[in-house]
């Protein structure tokens, strides 16, 4: 059929995707619906999957960057976050795969949207969906999701995660609870590009190129991924253990007294303009941008 499907479970939605040739869409969709309705348990495959997940977790603990990323997640979200909303080792090992298969069988019974990107006419797509998409007469509401909150930082706090390595990772996180404001986005983008973005940014040039105090350094104000989330300000340094104090002092100085550079400013401005001129939302990304 020259088609394939995939499943994407996320922190706030799960979706299945079917792609292929236009002329094979009816047959592909019929087979796809059959798989969803009649998926069978394979205990050996589940055992291998659980083993792979646990192996990846064990390997991640041996990676300094992975450990540091989890510390950042804790600083931003607190003890309950999307990163911690996973099955424990015991839950994975004791899980009955039939429970997972039952969830697959029920996926069409919940409220859902259908997105189509392709050459077929709208009415033809609707006819195929009506013929092959198996849904009950009454759809069920999607179960309420777990709500996670990004934690404000009203006072200074230090979080330490011991890791035996020859360099340290340092980050400062600030959340004042400020919600998304489209009016400040141009200034925010310019600040990130000029001050903390890439290799031409002030932070990188000062910390690595001019002072030799860091392997990598950056700072940026993160735009909320959803309207319910606030802006989060983050800094980052990777440096040798014996340069930690000097690097942190220099970083504070640069942040509180931002150096001015006409050359760096123009480079940042040109980079933003080039990005705006060349970036396009195309194809199926138009649909996803609308949903998001």
Model-derived features: where do they sit?
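Charge-rich, well-structured scaffold segments of protease-associated domains
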Residues: 1-142, 211, 216-292
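Short Gly/charged-rich anion-binding patches and loops
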Residues: 99, 202-203
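His/Glu-based metal-binding/catalytic segments typifying zinc-dependent metallopeptidases
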Residues: 141-202
């Amino acid at each position: 059929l020259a088609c394939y499907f995939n499943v994407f479970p996320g922190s706030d939605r799960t979706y299945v995707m079917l792609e292929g040739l236009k002329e094979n869409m009816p047959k592909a969709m019929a087979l796809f619906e059959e798989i969803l309705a009649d998926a069978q348990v394979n205990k050996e495959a589940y055992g291998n999957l659980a083993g792979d997940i646990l192996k990846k977790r064990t390997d991640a603990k041996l990676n300094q960057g992975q450990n540091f990323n989890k510390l950042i997640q804790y600083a931003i979200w607190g003890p309950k976050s999307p990163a911690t909303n996973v099955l424990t080792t015991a839950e994975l090992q004791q899980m009955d795969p039939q429970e997972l298969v039952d969830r697959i069988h029920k996926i069409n019974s919940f409220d859902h949207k259908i997105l189509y990107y392709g050459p077929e006419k709208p009415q033809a797509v609707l006819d195929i969906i009506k013929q092959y998409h198996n849904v009950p007469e009454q759809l069920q509401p999607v179960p309420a999701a777990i709500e996670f909150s990004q934690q404000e930082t009203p006072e200074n706090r230090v979080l330490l995660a011991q890791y035996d390595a020859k360099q340290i990772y340092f980050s400062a996180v600030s959340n004042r609870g400020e919600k998304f404001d489209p009016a400040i986005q141009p200034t925010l983008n310019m600040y990130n590009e000029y001050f903390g973005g890439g290799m031409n940014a002030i932070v990188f040039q000062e910390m690595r190129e001019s002072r030799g105090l860091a392997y990598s350094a950056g700072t940026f104000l993160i735009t909320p991924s959803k309207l319910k989330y606030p802006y989060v300000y983050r800094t980052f340094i990777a440096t040798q253990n014996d340069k930690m104090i000097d690097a942190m002092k220099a970083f504070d100085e640069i942040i509180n007294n931002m150096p001015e550079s006409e050359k760096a400013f123009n480079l940042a401005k040109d980079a933003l303009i080039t990005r705006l001129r060349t970036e396009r939302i195309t194809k199926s990304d138009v649909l996803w941008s609308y949903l998001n």
